[in-house]
């Protein structure tokens, strides 16, 4: 993490996106040092069940996703007992980024999950959201990203996202910026709670050029939070050149939008 701070301090970037929950994906198979919720007594699961060697042998899809999940997360996690140490670490990160002049775009939900956090019921989701917003909203540099790739939550209807957004808006007296990010299907960014469009390319050719369509359609700032990553991975989302990502930055910029860089070497 210190290397990340050093890199940010030497760069011109002034916003970073990061997840509240740990991430389960190819190249992210180690167990986190802490968990966001307390483990129940007599839990049928333990961290040793997710040893890296076991996960490396699990089946994966063409995008790098790996099939693994706690069978009954409600029997493992006490969703009414957030882990204070876990959230203190996030809070310290937000505060430190603020001293560097960097915006902290917090991703509240994501589907890359083996622990079951993406499967919380609506009551559990909104308890978690109240805790997070109450704890972090006082920081001037916080943004709320309702989800990364919301449409990969195949089991979660739009009504739940709207309920989540209502909770965030109600709990946040400072009206921080709010968005929701897509994979292949765009969210309706005309919704009143959305302050800006957080977008991923949905056209493999017009990766950023569609800003000229989205800006007049939604009448809101358009941030290309995912236009693929500069890197050398064997996946199409993570192997474009530095020259190509530079071009993809200029495409939205000249149309009144914004781009975000990511490296996957």
Feature locations, PLM:
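Active-site mouth of glycoside hydrolases
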Residues: 1-207
